[in-house]
Amino acid sequence: MHTKFPAFKTLLLESHYDGLVLLVTLNRPEVGNAFNTLMGQELESLWNLLTVDAHGVRCLVLTAAGGRIFCAGADLKERNGMSKEQWQKQHEVFERQYFAMIDLPIPVIGAINGHAYAGGLEIALCCDFLYASNNIRFALTEVTLGIMPGAGGTQNLPRAVGERRAKEIIMTGKPFSSEQAFEWGLVNHIFEPQDVVDQALNTAQVIASNAPLSVKQTKRSIRYGSQMELKTAYRFEIEAYNHLVDTDDRVEGIRAFNEKRKPVFKGT
């Protein structure tokens, strides 16, 4: 548990590398780590807390308990019998969680250690990049239930695998393998199941050792710049760059290079 954050009922938090990396684990393995209303509320709360004050955390790793299912999507047992109003009210919770996550200034690595279906794949798509087990499957199955992806799936998946492939995946609802996900560029690396989280933590440590303001500005520039006309995006990148010129870390980085030592970045 990370003592600087509250205890959650549906999430486990573990601090790594002297508090620079936070491992966030979805913790409802008895129901395939499916999202219920409480999990949505707790995730939103955590993302908002990290946005306001990260307490020194420079990188997140998101994974799940149980090892077989990363996340099965929304808890359909909880949704069974919901009125239209109850359904929409719950989905607003999931929407707020989604927007809070994609607006996180610090990077999030998804360590997808089990099957990721529906909303489970959608939250994975909200991560900055993914590592996955080599024996799992992904799917957006919403059309088989009379709905459609509603937490970024129709926007994030095409940006990851291309529009035509995303249409086939979403319109058929058919699952695909981690090997296919790697081939299509959805996941960066695939590993043996027991190695996924450790590999993600290792990469998180590397990211956390870099200048945190530089990492944040890089994430911001890529995310927002990719939605702009190219020339505007170039200028947006320069504005992000210019914010780093007047920082202590910029001075420290150049000084450390010339002194042939490892820099000590403080995020100032």
Description of each model-found segment:
Residues 1-63, 81, 99:
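Conserved CoA-thioester-binding segment of acyl-CoA-metabolizing enzymes
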Residues 44, 64-99, 116, 146, ...:
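Glycine- (often His-adjacent) and acidic-residue-rich active-site loop
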Residues 102-213, 243-247, 251-255, 261, ...:
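Crotonase-fold acyl-CoA enzyme core
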Residues 1-20, 51-55, 67, 173-179, ...:
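C-terminal alpha-helix plus adjacent terminal tail
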Residues 24, 28, 43, 62, ...:
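Terminal peptide-recognition signature
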Residues 6, 19, 55-57, 74, ...:
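Structured loop/turn residues at beta-strand edges in well-structured enzyme cores
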Residues 34-37, 72, 81, 171, ...:
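Phosphate-coordinating loops and pocket residues in cytosolic domains that bind phosphorylated ligands
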Residues 39-43, 90-93, 123, 196, ...:
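Hydrophobic alpha-helical membrane-association signature
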